[in-house]
């Protein structure tokens, strides 16, 4: 199941599994892992320039002010942070926020990371665009916007 389904647009506020992306670019792919008796899908092997798309969020008149992502960075040196750009409607669309993911010590050692976002209204696709050095950057488990 992806976000490009027949059920209508998504609300930006509930937590969404990252593995529900409707499009992935580059080396990134969906993996699953058994956590607390339930298989969770997440995006793995993300590299510089890869992106994940989610269609469509209905922001309506919701006053979102932030964004939180559960992610992991298997690097051990703090100079190897990954950067995630939150863009609307395309990989080079309007930038609404930027999130840094420093090393967490393991590729599934999930931590929550947050950033402020610019106000958004209406219906939009969300593109998570990833940047960094040295091949594999991070894994992403889930995310949501904050009102």
Which role fits each region the language model picked out?
Residues 1-147:
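Extracytoplasmic
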